[in-house]
Amino acid sequence: TLFRSAELFNRAAKGVRLTLAGEQFLVDCQAVLAMLEQACNNVRAVESGQKGVLKLGATMYASYSVVPHVAIQHRDTYSDVELHFQEMVPSDLHAALQDGRLDAAISFSETATPGIHSLVLLREPLIAALPANHPQVQSEHFRLESLSDDPFITVPRQSAPMLYDSILHQCLKAGFSPQIGLEASVQQTVMNFVARGVGVALIPASMENAQLRGVVYRRLENPNMVENMLMWSTKNKNPALPGFVNLCRSIRDKLDAAQSGRIND
Protein backbone atom coordinates (compact mmCIF):
# COMPACT_ATOMS: atom_id res chain seq x y z
CA THR A 1 0.00 0.00 0.00
CA LEU A 2 1.02 3.64 -0.57
CA PHE A 3 -0.93 5.00 2.36
CA ARG A 4 -1.12 3.64 5.87
CA SER A 5 -4.78 4.53 6.20
CA ALA A 6 -6.01 3.35 2.80
CA GLU A 7 -5.67 0.25 0.67
CA LEU A 8 -5.31 1.16 -3.02
CA PHE A 9 -5.35 -2.35 -4.42
CA ASN A 10 -5.90 -5.93 -3.36
CA ARG A 11 -3.73 -8.84 -4.33
CA ALA A 12 -5.53 -12.04 -5.24
CA ALA A 13 -4.72 -15.32 -6.93
CA LYS A 14 -5.92 -13.94 -10.26
CA GLY A 15 -3.92 -10.71 -10.01
CA VAL A 16 -4.24 -7.23 -8.55
CA ARG A 17 -7.47 -5.23 -8.39
CA LEU A 18 -7.99 -1.62 -7.40
CA THR A 19 -10.01 -0.89 -4.35
CA LEU A 20 -12.60 1.90 -4.40
CA ALA A 21 -9.97 4.19 -2.89
CA GLY A 22 -7.51 3.07 -5.55
CA GLU A 23 -9.98 3.81 -8.35
CA GLN A 24 -10.51 7.34 -6.99
CA PHE A 25 -6.76 7.84 -6.66
CA LEU A 26 -6.30 6.79 -10.31
CA VAL A 27 -8.95 9.26 -11.48
CA ASP A 28 -7.33 12.07 -9.49
CA CYS A 29 -3.86 11.23 -10.81
CA GLN A 30 -5.14 11.29 -14.39
CA ALA A 31 -6.70 14.70 -13.73
CA VAL A 32 -3.43 16.02 -12.30
CA LEU A 33 -1.50 14.78 -15.34
CA ALA A 34 -4.06 16.41 -17.65
CA MET A 35 -3.74 19.70 -15.75
CA LEU A 36 0.04 19.48 -15.94
CA GLU A 37 -0.14 18.93 -19.70
CA GLN A 38 -2.54 21.88 -20.07
CA ALA A 39 -0.23 24.06 -17.96
CA CYS A 40 2.68 23.20 -20.25
CA ASN A 41 0.54 23.96 -23.30
CA ASN A 42 -0.49 27.30 -21.78
CA VAL A 43 3.13 28.24 -21.14
CA ARG A 44 4.05 27.43 -24.74
CA ALA A 45 1.02 29.38 -26.03
CA VAL A 46 1.87 32.46 -23.97
CA GLU A 47 5.52 32.29 -24.95
CA SER A 48 4.59 32.10 -28.64
CA GLY A 49 2.06 34.94 -28.40
CA GLN A 50 -0.97 32.70 -28.98
CA LYS A 51 -2.36 33.28 -25.49
CA GLY A 52 -2.23 36.15 -23.02
CA VAL A 53 -3.25 39.80 -22.76
CA LEU A 54 -2.48 42.76 -25.03
CA LYS A 55 -3.17 46.30 -23.82
CA LEU A 56 -4.18 48.64 -26.67
CA GLY A 57 -4.75 52.36 -26.32
CA ALA A 58 -6.27 54.65 -28.93
CA THR A 59 -7.75 58.06 -29.47
CA MET A 60 -11.53 58.30 -29.38
CA TYR A 61 -11.36 59.31 -33.04
CA ALA A 62 -9.67 55.99 -33.93
CA SER A 63 -12.74 54.18 -32.58
CA TYR A 64 -14.61 55.51 -35.61
CA SER A 65 -11.98 54.43 -38.12
CA VAL A 66 -9.27 51.87 -37.39
CA VAL A 67 -10.03 50.26 -34.04
CA PRO A 68 -13.19 48.29 -34.99
CA HIS A 69 -11.41 46.66 -37.95
CA VAL A 70 -8.39 45.77 -35.83
CA ALA A 71 -10.46 44.45 -32.92
CA ILE A 72 -12.56 42.14 -35.11
CA GLN A 73 -9.56 40.77 -36.99
CA HIS A 74 -7.65 40.24 -33.74
CA ARG A 75 -10.58 38.38 -32.17
CA ASP A 76 -10.84 36.08 -35.19
CA THR A 77 -7.08 35.45 -35.41
CA TYR A 78 -5.96 35.41 -31.77
CA SER A 79 -9.04 34.29 -29.85
CA ASP A 80 -6.97 33.34 -26.77
CA VAL A 81 -5.28 36.74 -26.50
CA GLU A 82 -7.45 39.15 -24.53
CA LEU A 83 -7.48 42.66 -25.99
CA HIS A 84 -7.76 45.28 -23.26
CA PHE A 85 -8.75 48.62 -24.81
CA GLN A 86 -8.44 52.11 -23.36
CA GLU A 87 -9.19 55.53 -24.89
CA MET A 88 -6.73 58.37 -24.26
CA VAL A 89 -5.72 61.69 -25.79
CA PRO A 90 -2.63 61.43 -28.05
CA SER A 91 -0.17 62.97 -25.59
CA ASP A 92 -1.16 60.47 -22.88
CA LEU A 93 -0.84 57.54 -25.30
CA HIS A 94 2.83 58.28 -25.87
CA ALA A 95 3.53 58.42 -22.14
CA ALA A 96 1.66 55.14 -21.55
CA LEU A 97 3.68 53.41 -24.27
CA GLN A 98 6.97 54.56 -22.84
CA ASP A 99 6.24 53.54 -19.26
CA GLY A 100 4.74 50.17 -20.21
CA ARG A 101 1.10 50.78 -19.30
CA LEU A 102 0.22 50.04 -22.94
CA ASP A 103 1.63 47.48 -25.37
CA ALA A 104 0.46 49.36 -28.47
CA ALA A 105 -1.37 52.56 -29.37
CA ILE A 106 -3.29 53.92 -32.35
CA SER A 107 -3.15 57.68 -32.75
CA PHE A 108 -2.39 60.54 -35.11
CA SER A 109 1.05 60.61 -36.68
CA GLU A 110 3.66 62.41 -34.65
CA THR A 111 7.30 63.34 -35.00
CA ALA A 112 9.71 60.44 -34.59
CA THR A 113 10.30 59.46 -30.95
CA PRO A 114 13.38 57.45 -29.93
CA GLY A 115 12.40 53.95 -28.84
CA ILE A 116 8.97 54.07 -30.50
CA HIS A 117 8.24 52.14 -33.70
CA SER A 118 5.33 53.21 -35.89
CA LEU A 119 3.28 51.88 -38.79
CA VAL A 120 0.81 53.89 -40.89
CA LEU A 121 -2.56 52.11 -40.86
CA LEU A 122 -4.80 54.62 -42.65
CA ARG A 123 -4.58 57.97 -44.41
CA GLU A 124 -7.78 59.99 -44.72
CA PRO A 125 -8.73 63.56 -45.66
CA LEU A 126 -9.87 66.40 -43.47
CA ILE A 127 -13.48 67.45 -43.98
CA ALA A 128 -15.47 70.43 -42.71
CA ALA A 129 -18.10 70.02 -39.99
CA LEU A 130 -20.76 72.74 -39.88
CA PRO A 131 -23.81 73.35 -37.69
CA ALA A 132 -26.93 72.24 -39.53
CA ASN A 133 -28.23 75.84 -39.63
CA HIS A 134 -25.00 77.32 -41.02
CA PRO A 135 -25.55 79.43 -44.18
CA GLN A 136 -22.91 77.48 -46.12
CA VAL A 137 -24.82 74.22 -45.70
CA GLN A 138 -27.02 75.26 -48.63
CA SER A 139 -24.08 76.35 -50.80
CA GLU A 140 -23.87 74.34 -54.02
CA HIS A 141 -20.09 74.79 -54.27
CA PHE A 142 -18.63 74.84 -50.77
CA ARG A 143 -15.28 76.56 -50.34
CA LEU A 144 -13.30 76.58 -47.11
CA GLU A 145 -12.53 80.30 -47.35
CA SER A 146 -16.25 80.96 -46.80
CA LEU A 147 -15.62 80.02 -43.14
CA SER A 148 -12.89 82.62 -42.61
CA ASP A 149 -15.11 84.69 -40.29
CA ASP A 150 -16.37 81.72 -38.27
CA PRO A 151 -14.93 80.62 -34.92
CA PHE A 152 -13.13 77.28 -35.26
CA ILE A 153 -13.26 74.53 -32.66
CA THR A 154 -10.09 72.48 -32.64
CA VAL A 155 -7.83 70.30 -30.53
CA PRO A 156 -5.12 71.96 -28.41
CA ARG A 157 -1.78 71.74 -30.15
CA GLN A 158 -0.13 70.14 -27.12
CA SER A 159 -2.62 67.24 -27.29
CA ALA A 160 -2.33 66.46 -31.02
CA PRO A 161 0.30 68.67 -32.70
CA MET A 162 0.18 67.00 -36.12
CA LEU A 163 -3.61 67.25 -36.35
CA TYR A 164 -3.59 70.85 -35.16
CA ASP A 165 -0.90 71.81 -37.67
CA SER A 166 -2.75 70.04 -40.49
CA ILE A 167 -5.92 71.99 -39.71
CA LEU A 168 -4.02 75.28 -39.53
CA HIS A 169 -2.21 74.56 -42.80
CA GLN A 170 -5.51 73.69 -44.52
CA CYS A 171 -6.90 77.10 -43.62
CA LEU A 172 -3.72 78.89 -44.65
CA LYS A 173 -3.93 77.17 -48.06
CA ALA A 174 -7.42 78.64 -48.37
CA GLY A 175 -6.04 82.12 -47.71
CA PHE A 176 -6.91 82.78 -44.07
CA SER A 177 -5.77 82.08 -40.52
CA PRO A 178 -8.55 80.43 -38.50
CA GLN A 179 -10.10 82.19 -35.54
CA ILE A 180 -9.82 79.66 -32.70
CA GLY A 181 -13.02 80.02 -30.73
CA LEU A 182 -12.65 76.98 -28.49
CA GLU A 183 -10.30 74.06 -27.93
CA ALA A 184 -11.28 70.52 -26.89
CA SER A 185 -8.99 67.52 -26.55
CA VAL A 186 -11.59 64.93 -27.62
CA GLN A 187 -13.00 64.85 -31.15
CA GLN A 188 -16.47 63.90 -29.92
CA THR A 189 -16.52 67.06 -27.81
CA VAL A 190 -15.47 69.11 -30.83
CA MET A 191 -18.41 67.61 -32.73
CA ASN A 192 -20.85 68.31 -29.91
CA PHE A 193 -19.86 71.98 -29.88
CA VAL A 194 -20.37 72.16 -33.65
CA ALA A 195 -23.82 70.59 -33.30
CA ARG A 196 -24.72 73.26 -30.74
CA GLY A 197 -23.68 76.04 -33.11
CA VAL A 198 -20.63 77.15 -31.12
CA GLY A 199 -18.46 77.12 -34.24
CA VAL A 200 -17.17 75.10 -37.18
CA ALA A 201 -14.40 72.49 -37.33
CA LEU A 202 -12.09 70.57 -39.62
CA ILE A 203 -12.09 66.91 -38.65
CA PRO A 204 -10.79 63.57 -39.99
CA ALA A 205 -13.29 62.12 -42.46
CA SER A 206 -14.05 59.00 -40.41
CA MET A 207 -15.63 61.16 -37.70
CA GLU A 208 -18.61 61.34 -40.04
CA ASN A 209 -19.32 57.81 -38.81
CA ALA A 210 -20.39 59.36 -35.49
CA GLN A 211 -23.63 60.40 -37.26
CA LEU A 212 -24.22 63.25 -34.85
CA ARG A 213 -27.49 65.13 -35.26
CA GLY A 214 -27.10 68.82 -35.96
CA VAL A 215 -23.84 68.46 -37.90
CA VAL A 216 -23.42 68.66 -41.68
CA TYR A 217 -20.21 67.55 -43.40
CA ARG A 218 -18.68 69.10 -46.50
CA ARG A 219 -15.76 67.86 -48.60
CA LEU A 220 -12.73 70.09 -49.13
CA GLU A 221 -10.81 70.86 -52.29
CA ASN A 222 -7.28 69.48 -52.11
CA PRO A 223 -7.67 68.30 -48.50
CA ASN A 224 -4.76 67.62 -46.19
CA MET A 225 -4.43 63.97 -45.21
CA VAL A 226 -4.45 62.73 -41.62
CA GLU A 227 -2.62 59.53 -40.69
CA ASN A 228 -3.71 56.88 -38.22
CA MET A 229 -0.59 55.18 -36.89
CA LEU A 230 0.08 52.08 -34.84
CA MET A 231 2.88 52.70 -32.33
CA TRP A 232 4.75 50.43 -29.92
CA SER A 233 7.87 50.57 -27.77
CA THR A 234 11.04 48.80 -28.84
CA LYS A 235 11.47 47.77 -25.18
CA ASN A 236 8.14 45.94 -25.01
CA LYS A 237 8.61 42.19 -24.45
CA ASN A 238 4.97 41.04 -24.61
CA PRO A 239 5.04 37.86 -26.78
CA ALA A 240 1.61 38.78 -28.18
CA LEU A 241 2.85 42.10 -29.60
CA PRO A 242 4.68 40.86 -32.76
CA GLY A 243 1.59 38.96 -33.90
CA PHE A 244 -0.58 42.01 -33.30
CA VAL A 245 1.77 44.24 -35.31
CA ASN A 246 1.81 41.74 -38.19
CA LEU A 247 -1.98 41.51 -38.09
CA CYS A 248 -2.28 45.30 -38.33
CA ARG A 249 0.20 45.33 -41.18
CA SER A 250 -1.87 42.73 -43.06
CA ILE A 251 -5.13 44.69 -42.88
CA ARG A 252 -3.85 48.08 -44.04
CA ASP A 253 -5.15 47.51 -47.57
CA LYS A 254 -8.60 46.61 -46.20
CA LEU A 255 -8.67 49.79 -44.15
CA ASP A 256 -7.70 51.92 -47.15
CA ALA A 257 -10.34 50.23 -49.31
CA ALA A 258 -13.05 50.74 -46.70
CA GLN A 259 -12.12 54.41 -46.29
CA SER A 260 -11.94 55.04 -50.06
CA GLY A 261 -15.35 53.48 -50.58
CA ARG A 262 -16.92 55.64 -47.88
CA ILE A 263 -15.36 58.86 -49.16
CA ASN A 264 -16.46 58.17 -52.74
CA ASP A 265 -20.08 57.44 -51.81
PLM feature segments, named:
Residues F3-A6, F25-E47:
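Alpha-helical linker/hinge and terminal dimerization helices associated
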Residues F3-L18:
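A short LG(V/I)-centered, amphipathic sequence patch enriched
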Residues K51-P114, L182-A184:
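Central regulatory/effector-binding core of bacterial HTH transcription factors
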Residues V66, V215-S260:
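A late-sequence structural motif
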Residues V89-L102, S107-F108, R157-V215:
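Hydrophobic hinge/microswitch elements
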Residues P114-V120, E124-P125, Q136, Q188-K235:
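Beta-alpha-beta core module
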Residues I116-L126, L130-F152, T234, P239-P242:
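Flexible hinge/capping segments at coil-to-helix
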Residues F152-A174, N238-G243, R252-G261:
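Secondary-structure junction motif
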